Amino acid sequence: MSTVLAIHGSPRGERSHSRRLADAFLQAWQAANPQGRLTRREVGRGALPHVSEAFIAAAFYPQPEARPLSMQADLALSDELVAELLDHQRLVISAPMHNFSVPSGIKAWVDHIVRLGLTFNTQQDNGVAQYQPLVQGKKVLIVTSRGGGGFGPGGEHEAMNHADRWLRTALGFIGIEDVTVVAAEGEESAPERFAQSCGEAQQRLLALAQSF
């Protein structure tokens, strides 16, 4: 049975363009995979706390198997999010570009799932840290929208794109390298072009849904 975890990162919820595009994809995916399992995780409306000092102390406790109960409680949500990620074969992330990066809820989610001993390991080699990704066999679709244009590959503002490019880096760090990005651009800078861009993005998403 195919399984998809959808991470919704916009604080605008259903009014978000990236969310609407992702929903169109997910609807098409469900139609193509009637026996598939879809799980949704809302992180864009303040539902997910950012990591705290207590979280950091617990996550990097030198003896993870001997964490006090209080530390285990500090990591309970993170443990749940990691387990949720590992339990699904496919991941769909809807995340608009906010000030050249991702919404803070997406950053919080990444901070919770990039976990030493769970999604990556590290060891010293001649005093230099070597990282080992632990997540295997996952495939990711990033659905994004951008107020301006030219932020995609080869665009004039590509170097300013720290949104989906950063997500690729973070996911690759834990072992997820099969990543596809579908973007709609120009909501604020070129409304007429944006409508066309959304249409093109949706057509691409509907095609991707058949084999995701």
From Swiss-Prot:
Listed EC numbers: 1.6.5.-, 1.7.1.17
Q: Which residues bind FMN?
A: S10, S16, H17, S18, S145, R146, G147, G148
Q: Which UniProt keywords apply?
A: Flavoprotein, FMN, NAD, Oxidoreductase
The UniProt entry, under Pfam families, shows: Flavodoxin_2
Q: Which residues form a coiled coil?
A: none
What would you give as a GO molecular function for this chain, any one?
A: electron transfer activity
The coenzyme or cofactor needed here is:
FMN
The record's function comment reads: Quinone reductase that provides resistance to thiol-specific stress caused by electrophilic quinones.
Report the PANTHER family cross-referenced here: FMN-DEPENDENT NADH-AZOREDUCTASE 1 (PTHR43741), FMN-DEPENDENT NADH:QUINONE OXIDOREDUCTASE (PTHR43741:SF2)
Instruction: Report the HAMAP family cross-referenced here.
Output: Azoreductase_type1
Protein name (database record):
FMN-dependent NADH:quinone oxidoreductase 1
Species this protein is from = Pseudomonas fluorescens (strain ATCC BAA-477 / NRRL B-23932 / Pf-5)
Q: What gene is this protein translated from?
A: azoR1
